[in-house]
Amino acid sequence: MRLLLVRPPARNTVETEVPRAVEAESTSYPPLNLLVLATWLRAHGRHEVAILDAQLEDLEPAAITRRIQDWRADVVGISTFTVQLVDVLRTVRAARAAASVRHVVLGGPHCNDFPEEARALPGVSAVVRGEGQAPLLALLDAWEKGEAPRGLPGVMVGSDDPVPDPVVLSDDLDSYPIPDRTLVDYRRYTGLLGQGGLFTTVVTSRGCPHRCTFCNTPRMRFKGASPARICDELEACVALDIRDIYFVDDTFNVTNQRVHEICDEIIARRLKVTWTARMRVNGVDRALIEKMKAAGCQRIQFGVEQGTDAGLKRLQKGVTIAEVEAAFALCRELGVGTVAYFMIGTPTERNRLDVLRTIRYAVRLAPDFVMFNILTPFPGTRLFDEGLAEGVLRLEPWQAFMRDPRPDFRAQVWDQYFTRDELRDLLTLAYRSFYWRPSFVLGQLRELRRPADLARKAKAGLRLLLDR
């Protein structure tokens, strides 16, 4: 059979009070989940598999239908995130409008968290939970043979089917094939704060052992690929002249030893790459940052979230302000760039002064860049459950949206102490307080190496400041 994997466009993403520039950044990343899936299926089955990144190309539904029909797809598999349900449903309809299509399958985070709601969407033939490689291959084999695909692990076909457990293909991440990035137009992907050359994302692990209340990742046990497997993938990227790498693990430094081993392998292979990683501040020490810099690390993204120990404790971050300041001071001393992520409108911010305290702390911390967003609790997180228990949040709006996705839906904020409009005004103030400082502008100008850097940084800054 001919399977076309589609990443839907991002024209109607749920408004989550994250600046659109930050949301848009992730839409310019390659669809790693689909690349991994397609590479595995092409290696293990006889079916023909291709990828359509409708997000990268910003395709209208009619254009999606034409592309599906032109490729003569029998089955369309759609990557599904809850915040993109409007575009997911429109992509389902676009697929059904193609004469060649017999089945439409949904998979991805939304199907893991809300399988029954996903299966109930009109036009959907089946839903896959967990890692889709083996379930999707079994589905294709069954449909090709004309068999009813009932009882397949990880697959929900009929609306009366029991909800299957999510499938985990293997805990050995080294057994996964290196994603074939040539299945998409890999030269077109960019990062908001990238280094300017060809860019891609790499995942080296699954899950996170930490317990932040606003995140649903803690439900997944941490497993990491070996340094050798990671560097094999980096070598494959370099072979395509991709040298700007963003490690998008939930937490890159789960242990310092693992980071040291990865860096040692990069250095031993003399890989000429620059890279960014997402890390926690606790455990960061001089030896670690020095090793990371020697291995090509240009920038570290830290989730700081709050400017007080009380705020960090409420979110169960498991870090302290002292650890935050030590990590940023060390990076500054050793010449490694930093990005700090902050939330405003959290349960411990009960008045304007509390929010201003977070904003002022972000300025005083002096990262190279900062990303602010308004706290938006999502169903499935402990913070959302706490909001339900306290009467701050309601599940019904999300349930209605999942049944009937509409573009005017807006995710709930923690509005116990502020209105949405008040929080948006404070968000604007936060960005202006940081990025409109003369010291920040002059510092960025001093770091320019070529004219293209000026254009890239100016574009990023304008999007952060004005695209709201």
List each language-model region with its residue ranges.
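Acidic, low-complexity intrinsically disordered segments
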Residues: 1-239
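Radical SAM enzyme core and accessory elements
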Residues: 2-5, 12, 46-48, 65, ...
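A structural motif corresponding to the C-terminal end of an alpha-helix
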Residues: 37-50, 99, 240, 269, ...
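Short acidic/polar active-site loop segments enriched in Thr and Asp
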Residues: 47, 74, 243-245, 298, ...
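Residue-level detector of structured alpha->beta connecting loops
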Residues: 72, 123, 296, 335-337, ...
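Catalytic cores of alpha/beta
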Residues: 115-120, 288, 349-364
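Radical SAM [4Fe-4S] cluster-binding motif and immediate context
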Residues: 174, 178-348, 360
